[in-house]
Amino acid sequence: MPHVVPITADFAVARALRTEDFEVVAAQGFRTIINFLPDGETQFQVSAADARRLCEKAGMAYAHVPAQKYGVFTDGVVMAARQALASLQSPVLAYCASGQRAAIVWAAAKSQSMPVDAVLATLTSAGFDFGYIRDDLEQQADRPRWQPAGGSADQSPIEQPAA
């Protein structure tokens, strides 16, 4: 059973899910899974294609937003995360190797619509000490003012469950 860390009432993070975890988190009430692991990052991880199939089987929506460990603040990752968070049903469980990257990407996405102090306070309440990313979050908060209209969104990673 995965160790789930709630960030908000509608969003939680976890370490990489195993095959047997998908049914468990669906039974816990999660409606969407966001996978921030690039395929092949860890030796025994569930592939993105298998994770999608497991989500479909469990009746959950799925988004794969591969975020390299040192690439969490890239336009494509942040925009895809924002899109997934805005359009998919909650509650959402996001995962990566440890859960920290998922929390950081959430913070980057939320900092464009929520004060950075509030984002960091929310993370602190959940047990994460991410004060060291304040400058990165401040840059994300300023993006809407200087990013070109339409941004640089990559192709949508969002996959809905099969009907």
List each language-model region with its residue ranges.
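Cys-dependent protein tyrosine phosphatase-like superfamily
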Residues: 1-92, 107-163
